Every structure is written in structure tokens, then in C-alpha cells.
């Protein structure tokens, strides 16, 4: 399983978890309310709370329960098999997500802790699924030597930017920021970059080798401390910009010994192919559930 695919799965899992939590909270909060309560009217006709909750359960009930089962299955079997994941292992994979894959975004819905919890879950799941697969040290070293770019990164800067049409407006932006306005809010309101403005101007982690990033951004970022923004407008091809440095990561290369367990899981998961799914563990965990027969086939 390719590295970028793994992070896509993590991203998808986090999204599903957000939906599941929202659904569970909504249903629990509604427990004390009347099921016949009208929560909306359309042309004089009501939508009742009961109808709404049924629709929510039809759409999310099965997937929510399945996610809850999956987490418990992995936790129980990991404990049974005495699998333990170190904090350093989770931190390393999280660092690679940020710097190499540029996939990390933290917002009000998904925090750094939630990312790390999902990474820990994925590592445990992959360890369980691949526990009976042996990969020689020679094969692991060969993979590492052929794919070193997956385990190293240059100095990286997580940058936000606000792009406006002219220098005058850029200076107005600076006044707003100095007056206490948040960078994210001003970016959402003023930036002409429609791809990043909904995300507070977040460009993710960039390096000197990044495509489509003005070299002036990198040079300015080198002079800034985290959370500081540029004090003068930066001339760019489509106007003027103000940037903010959110985080800086120093260049690093992980050694073979540091990542060999991760490589073993990657190769073993590739060998499993479509069989690499948590549902293959349900029978071992003796699962029975509302939507199906006991355990799975």
C-alpha cells in the first residue's frame, strides 16, 4: 500500500469519525425530547424529530456502529496479542504525514490529538492484519534504499497567505491584523486565492523545491517566528500577499532502523491486498451486531 494511499485512508477515517460523533451526539441529545416535535416546516407541513432521526439512522446508523465495533475489535485484539505502540512511533508517522505527504490540517473538527489517535489505531490494525507475514531484513532494506524520499524532508514551512489585488489593500490587511483580527478570518474574507481562502489561507508545508510557491515566501518565512506574519506586502504575480508562518520543521532523514517496522507493515499490507480489512478480525473477536449475523464470513 503506497504511503499517500495510507494517509488518504486516515483522512477518510477521520471524516467518518466526525460524522459518527455528530450523529451520536444528536441522537443522545434528542432522547429527552418528544419524537413528534416539529423541527421544520415546509409549506405548512412539518418535519418531526422522529422522521429526522430515522433519516439520520438510515444514513449513518450502520456505519457509525461499524466504526465503533472496529475500534473496539482492534483495541481488544491488540491487548490480547500484547501489541504496544510507542509515542515516538506515532509522533514519527505524524511528522511524515505533515512534512512528506502534506496531508495534515487541524481545524475545529479534527485536532492533532485526533490525528494521532487515528494513526495509533491504523498502526495497531496493520500490526494485527500482518502479524503472520514474514518479510526478510534484506527486502526491508531494499525497499528503504529505493524509497528514501518517503522518509526524509528538507526544511519545511507551514505557511498561510492572504493575496489581494494591490499594495494599498495589502496594507489595509496589515492594519487589520495589527488591530487584532485573526489571520484565518481575514484570509477567508479578503484573499483572492479561492483555493486556500476557505482554509484560512493555509498552503500546508512547503519547501524551497515546492512548485508554484513564490521564492519570496520561503525567504520571508525563514525570518519569521511561528505565528508571526510578514510586516511588508510581498509582490506576487497576481497582486500582493501577506504570509504567516504557522510551523517550521527542520530537515530530517529517518534511518532504516527508525522506519523498518513501518516498511514491514507497508510491504505486508501490499501482499494482503483486498484482504487488508478490519472486518477479517471480527470473527476472532466474536462480534455480533444489530445489522447482521454473528461475526462475519
Curated annotation (Swiss-Prot):
Residues 154-247 form the PpiC domain. GO terms for molecular function: peptidyl-prolyl cis-trans isomerase activity. Its EC number is 5.2.1.8. Residues 1-32 form the signal peptide. Transmembrane segments: none annotated. Keywords: Isomerase, Rotamase, Signal. It is an enzyme of class 5 (isomerase). It catalyses: [protein]-peptidylproline (omega=180) = [protein]-peptidylproline (omega=0). SUPFAM superfamilies: FKBP-like, Triger factor/SurA peptide-binding domain-like. This is Putative peptidyl-prolyl cis-trans isomerase YacD. It comes from Bacillus subtilis (strain 168). The gene is yacD.
